[in-house]
């Protein structure tokens, strides 16, 4: 004789239970949403790198959280229509998550920087300053880049990179790495303001399927040569 099948419990919420849940957790949810909103609103590399990193962590967690929720919807679908939509959303979320990882790995191979896994952008600005390679994310595909020296402090596109530099340390070329290619920006203008300040403007001059040099001992010109095709 076969043992009787245990019925699967049906989980459902009444309107009163939902209202009770919101009343109990409303304050905590409000604080969490406010915190996320502030981080997303003010998380820029030109303002605070610490806040920007927190913003990237939040964005990075969005995809796995979305996949978990869509799978949960598939398991506890209300009807076949909801099940169909949940399956489609799950497949789309997984595909986009895989594409993100593939593109990030390709960009990491090109630059060797962990900023390649930035979920916000696939544009990484690379500048070689006296043998030290700085890599930072930028949102847009700019036609020009501006490097500024203010009393020894180096800024490029408003992002602070380091200290102890002068105008003579600025390289002849700056690069922006993308998933499929590398853009080279040539220094077209340099102006000195006072003894320890000034700025330089770099103009996009070449695009190719290259990677950054594996060594950091070269100058800015060496970086611009873009050896080691991939």
From Swiss-Prot:
Transmembrane segments annotated in the record for this chain: 25-45, 56-76, 85-105
One Gene Ontology MF term: structural constituent of virion
Chief location: virion
Top-level taxonomic group: Viruses
InterPro entries for the chain: M_CoV, M_HCoV-like
Virion surface compartment residues: 1-24, 77-84
Membrane topology value: Multi-pass membrane protein
Intravirion compartment spans: 46-55, 106-228
Compartment annotation: Virion membrane; Host Golgi apparatus membrane
Keyword line: Glycoprotein, Host Golgi apparatus, Host membrane, Host-virus interaction, Membrane, Transmembrane, Transmembrane helix, Viral envelope protein, Viral immunoevasion, Viral matrix protein, Virion
Gene Ontology cellular-component annotations: host cell Golgi membrane; membrane; viral envelope; virion membrane
Subunit note: Homomultimer. Interacts with envelope E protein in the budding compartment of the host cell, which is located between endoplasmic reticulum and the Golgi complex. Forms a complex with HE and S proteins. Interacts with nucleocapsid N protein. This interaction probably participates in RNA packaging into the virus.
Functional note: Component of the viral envelope that plays a central role in virus morphogenesis and assembly via its interactions with other viral proteins.
Family of the protein in this entry: Belongs to the betacoronaviruses M protein family.
Protein name: Membrane protein
Top-level taxonomy: Viruses, Riboviria, Orthornavirae, Pisuviricota, Pisoniviricetes
């Amino acid at each position: 004789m076969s043992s009787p099948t245990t019925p699967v419990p049906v989980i459902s919420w009444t309107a009163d239970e939902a209202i009770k849940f919101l009343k109990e957790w409303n304050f905590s949810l409000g604080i969490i949403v406010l915190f996320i909103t502030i981080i997303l609103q003010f998380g820029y590399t030109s303002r605070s790198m610490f806040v920007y990193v927190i913003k990237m962590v939040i964005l990075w967690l969005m995809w796995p959280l979305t996949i978990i929720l869509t799978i949960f919807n598939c398991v506890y679908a209300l009807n076949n229509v909801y099940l169909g939509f949940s399956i489609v959303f799950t497949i789309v979320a997984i595909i986009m998550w895989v594409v993100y990882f593939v593109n990030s790995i390709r960009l990491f191979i090109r630059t060797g920087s962990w900023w390649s896994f930035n979920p916000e952008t696939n544009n990484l600005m690379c500048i070689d300053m006296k043998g030290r390679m700085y890599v930072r994310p930028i949102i847009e595909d700019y036609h020009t880049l501006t490097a500024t020296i203010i009393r020894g402090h180096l800024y490029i596109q408003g992002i602070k990179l380091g200290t102890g530099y002068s105008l003579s340390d600025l390289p002849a070329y700056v690069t922006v790495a993308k998933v499929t290619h590398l853009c080279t920006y040539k220094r077209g203008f340099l102006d000195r303001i006072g003894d320890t300040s000034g700025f330089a403007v770099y103009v996009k001059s070449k695009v190719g399927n290259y990677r950054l040099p594996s060594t950091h001992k070269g100058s800015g010109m060496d970086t611009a040569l873009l050896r080691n095709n991939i």
